[in-house]
């Protein structure tokens, strides 16, 4: 990135420590809701806020101008062992209103993806499965994993009588405990 490199006295290849410290000073700052106005002022690109898992935060994201919300626990890196993100999705979608909600966290199969779409997610991210495929089989392995996830989603929809994603979304999810 030429803009980032212009902040450095030496190229990162020559002084990696300085590059790391500059990166941390530039991008490692704590962000607050008040920063959204600045973000909106410096770009015409859509702003998607990731890590929104509470309906109050979803409403605040919409109020501050987020173009989309990414309901995610960041792959469990930030805090592991909390409430499953899928259990939070419906409330986030409801609070977001017409603002699109994307989802990831624990998506390991086509079934997981279809459930998230039925709960209102507009799109579903898949993290670990394709990286496992990549590690084991390179690009072909990653492609195989993604094809398998899509095939499972298609099969689940077909056997349950939903020919399209619109049908899945219209049906929603009913959860029974007990």
Where do the language-model regions lie?
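Alpha/beta enzyme core
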Residues: 1-103, 110-132, 168
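C-terminal helical cap(s) of enzyme catalytic domains, especially alpha/beta-barrels
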Residues: 81, 85-95, 134-155
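Charged C-terminal helix
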Residues: 151-178
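Short coil/turn linker and secondary-structure boundary residues
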Residues: 31, 137, 160-163
